[in-house]
Amino acid sequence: KMDYKDLANLIFPDAKEISYYEEKYPERDLPEGAIVTRFAPSPTGFVHIGGLYQSLIARKLASQTNGVFFLRVEDTDQKREVENAVSGIVSSLKDFAIEPDEGMISEDEGKGNYGPYKQSQRKEIYQAYAKYLIEQGKAYPCFCTPEDVEEIRAKQEAAKIRPGYYGVWAKCRTVTVEDAIKRIQNGESYIIRFKSPGREDRKIQHHDVIKGKVDFPENDQDIVIIKADGLPTYHFAHAVDDHLMHTTHVIRGDEWLSSVPLHLQLFHELGFKAPKYAHIAPIMKNDNGNKRKLSKRKDAEAAVSYYAEEGIPAEAVKEYLMNIANSTFENWRRANPDKSMDEFQLQLNKMSVSGALFDMVKLLDVSKTVISKMTAEEVYENALNWASKYDQELAEILKDKEYALKVFGIERGNKKPRKDISKWSDVKENVEYMYNELFDKNEEEYPFQVINDKESIEKILKLYVEKYYDEN
């Protein structure tokens, strides 16, 4: 009689035993309490400010506990992939000095002992764990076509019941091993589904590091774990990767909160210890009185490239994001104006449960303070750097370094340094009266009106005396 093992061998004849990977990726040798975090974006476009926020928090927690922060690329959905997106992610993190200890360091290469760090290069690893689940009777081949699945959904909608592939609707769950083997040998195409042991009428209690106690119904969906192309789905890949890379804390946006029951179930059925989860509230925008998530489509400031274009220093953006992360940071910064942000202790359980509003005025205010602490030389280097990319005219006049340093040196480096620059794109406007070539150009644009009729002069003098003149 054919059994699960025969089925597993037919589907994945070349897959290794999972013990091979368990030995290849041993526990990390880290001090007690060390936190291992990751930033795991998909290479589908630019880095969103929310992604930067998550990485900043993940990097900080790893640093302050002598742990590890790594960059993993989740590229199993190859239809959505954008060319050179990985190097874009790597350089965005570099620009903000949020550098991973291991993981991807360019478009195709990674560093560290727990790689590959690109999911598309880990296909054989996922297949080994999928094979293991099939051997245990915890996963099965599903022969339903996309049309079959659509038909199931239509029936569920008509009957007004919960959509999905579960319970009586999971048609292939009950296909016998013999039948499955025959159908595969006949060349029928299939995917691999997880056989969920869950029941929707049972509750699970989960402790989220940020949100506290959360109750969910158990997962009962038989989700796809390996697609027709042999690559895993996000859910399955993340469970295998976070286990083998020994992630201790998964820090991610709270749009993933509803996946927790499924993820915990996958960890449990695979025999893994689950990581802790910390679900971060999104950064919101006030859109005419309505709070909504910052959106890649509608908001320029959602893309991290926006800050470089505007000339807002990376340091200022990080200070501002740390303010959003922990409200205690503001007082800490006031008490320690000259300390590095690295000395601040971030606490996950002090993070806000609801989304913070993105406040550009506040960010520019933080930025003014950051720039006010720079030396004339640093202001000059930064302004020139920015101008050479975004404003040729400014770059041209800054070529006279000696004069520029005098201009930037005015009221700088004393107890109350000037706070007139909030971003490098402000510089030209702030210094134009110090440069003939800029001032002359503006003089044509704003001609000075000469007033010489007696009536107007009397009117102005009278106004001055009433409003401003004080004999004392």
Protein language model regions, located:
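N-terminal Rossmann-like or analogous alpha/beta NTP/dinucleotide-binding catalytic cores
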Residues: 2-158, 258-272, 316
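Catalytic adenosine-cofactor/nucleotide-binding cores of aminoacyl-tRNA synthetases and other
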Residues: 270-455
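Active-site cores that bind ATP or allylic diphosphates and position pyrophosphate for catalysis
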Residues: 139-279, 284-293, 303, 455-471
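Acidic, glycine-rich active-site loops and adjacent beta-strand->loop/helix elements
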Residues: 73-79, 254-256, 281-284, 363
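Structured loops at beta-to-helix junctions and adjacent beta-edge loops in soluble globular domains
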Residues: 40, 143, 195-197, 228, ...
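Active-site-adjacent bridging/hinge elements
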Residues: 27-35, 64-66, 235-239, 288-295
